[in-house]
Amino acid sequence: MTQIKLLLLSLAITAQSITYDLPSQWDHQWLTQQPLGSDTTCTTSHLTAFQMSKTKDPIFFSTGGTDPFLSPKMLPLNSTAGEQWEFDGVSPDAKMAFVFGFYRDPNYAILGSGNLRVSVEMLWPNGTRFAQVDYPTDSVIEECEWGTRGVWRADEFSYSFEVSRDLQTARVAMHTPQVTGVVYLDSESKPRYPDGKIYPSETSTSEALPYFHFVEPIPVAKSQVDLMILGESYVWSDGVGGMERLWGAFSWFTCLQGMNVVRLHAGPYALSLLSFTSNIKKGNEYPSIALFENGEPVFSSQRTEDSDTADYFTFTKTYDGKVTGTLRDKVTGYELELVSPGEKKHWTFIIDHESLAFEYILGGGHGGSGFAGFVQGGRVGLEQFRGIALTEALTFPKKSPLFRSQYSETS
């Protein structure tokens, strides 16, 4: 544990080339405190790679309300439920991007590596991509008065994230044979539920669609990156990024047919969109969007049908741009329309892909493609702004040799 503390301290020192204001407690408490789990004012969740429930008794499963966004959403793990802490970002020139996933998820245990996983994907300016997946021996989530820290580790590597209590600041640190360094996020938004309400809300649920949940601790943020990848510097400032929490009672393959994600920042505007297509309620769409202006919420909706009274939005994939992926869906961008009849306000944002940031192939032309791009938009009739965006388009195949649906009407 002392080695991990020293590692985090050394990573903070190496990142001094980026000027960044961290919560004052972090360096005092987390970088010099006693080992993880020793502070009685903190709550600790420790899970090893093969640790899970040995019975069919019900487990704790979070469904929203005032449950802290960073807390584990299920304890203990069972054979179907899994969760993810996800961070992503894109550089200001839309030529570099990252996506990191911290997993407690038994659905990949069929590979023989246990229930813990960390995935790292980065886009280089020349268009090549770096990816690695590590399988930790254990993970620790420590929730303290000043924030939450997670560590996924094994003897040969460690990954960590730290998020301030107000969910406005985050940093991710990693030390592996191939990648070392730190990523920072500084929120341009407020933590939100699928219904658009701001955390905490006693009346909100995290269920975005049947058996699948999300919340966004950091919907949109400024991103700064200071990494070394295979001995080469990987650095940017003033990018865009964010953090999501995703979890489900069953696997993604069981719950989802598809997903679309947009995260953008343009002028005073920050926007987050997630739209899911259900595999349990076949083909039903479950969209959610939130718009922030100067960090404050100004629009949110789950409605995509026109209305004379209720706020609604539309999002349309475009296919006439210059950059697409290798999968069947050749999307090159998105067009977003947000309408508030009551406020007599209307916003539009048009995104064009600039780079293919990441891609994972699930067979038959299906899978996920993530893009870095540029956005132009703002309130109709007023000044328009140019900015950067990160998007993802995901479709699942109807059948897979690796995964089977875990749901039945008697589940």
From Swiss-Prot:
Any Pfam family matching the protein: DA_N
Family: Belongs to the Diels-Alderase family.
Function: Diels-Alderase; part of the gene cluster that mediates the biosynthesis of the cytotoxic leucine-containing cytochalasans, including aspochalasin C, aspochalasin E, TMC-169, flavichalasine F, aspergillin PZ, aspochalasin M and flavichalasine G. The first step in the pathway is catalyzed by the hybrid PKS-NRPS ffsA that utilizes 8 units of malonyl-CoA to iteratively assemble the octaketide chain before addition of L-leucine by the C-terminal NRPS modules. Because ffsA lacks a designated enoylreductase (ER) domain, the required activity is provided the enoyl reductase fssC.
First-tier enzyme category under EC: isomerase
Keyword flag Protein transport: no
Keyword Isomerase assigned: yes
Species classification: Eukaryota, Fungi, Dikarya, Ascomycota, Pezizomycotina
Transmembrane regions listed in the UniProt entry: none
UniProt-listed Enzyme Commission number(s): 5.5.1.-
Pathway: Mycotoxin biosynthesis
Name of protein: Diels-Alderase ffsF
Gene Ontology molecular function terms on file: isomerase activity
InterPro entries documented for this protein: DA_C
Keywords: Isomerase, Signal
First and last residue of the signal peptide: 1-17
Native organism: Aspergillus flavipes
